[in-house]
Amino acid sequence: MACGSLESVADEQVLYLTTVGRRTGLPREIEIWFVVRCERLYLFAETGEAANWVKNVRRNPKVSVRVGDWRIDATARVLDRQSDRKLWDQVAEIANRKYRWGDGLPVEITPVPSRATHCDSIQAGLDDF
């Protein structure tokens, strides 16, 4: 990441995920728990595929994230229980340690390297959120 590491926000309790509404095309923001592993963020959809934000990600994986002092453009990927079994179990364990909860459908958020910036240096850009 430019300007630092996602590990610096690992202790934050929530992040703000913005997806593109699959029907309206409008930005949709949610507050959600997360964990960090290997410079990626992992979120858990409690209601699995029924979660609107997961449906939005399935339609358009381009997302934005605000966490701590960071604003990050990223790509989201819903993990597959079969092909991503080991990763699924690892991030669920990290979430269990952080929140005492790690159920739900994990979604991996991978920052777009050139677009990850520290909010202090892009304060004007936050008005677009």
Give the residues covered by each predicted segment.
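Short, structured beta-strand-loop surface elements
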Residues: 48-123
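Generic signal for short, ordered secondary-structure residues
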Residues: 3-4, 36, 74, 88
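Short, solvent-exposed coil/turn segments
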Residues: 10-12, 27, 58, 102
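Extreme N-terminal tail/first-helix region
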Residues: 1-16, 119, 125-129
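Short beta-strand segments
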Residues: 12-46, 63
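Covalent nucleotidyltransferase core used to form phosphodiester bonds in nucleic acids
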Residues: 5-7, 42-55
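Extracellular/periplasmic catalytic domains that process cell-envelope and extracellular macromolecules
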Residues: 8, 35, 100-101
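Portal/gating segments that form or line small-molecule/metal binding sites
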Residues: 24, 73, 124-128
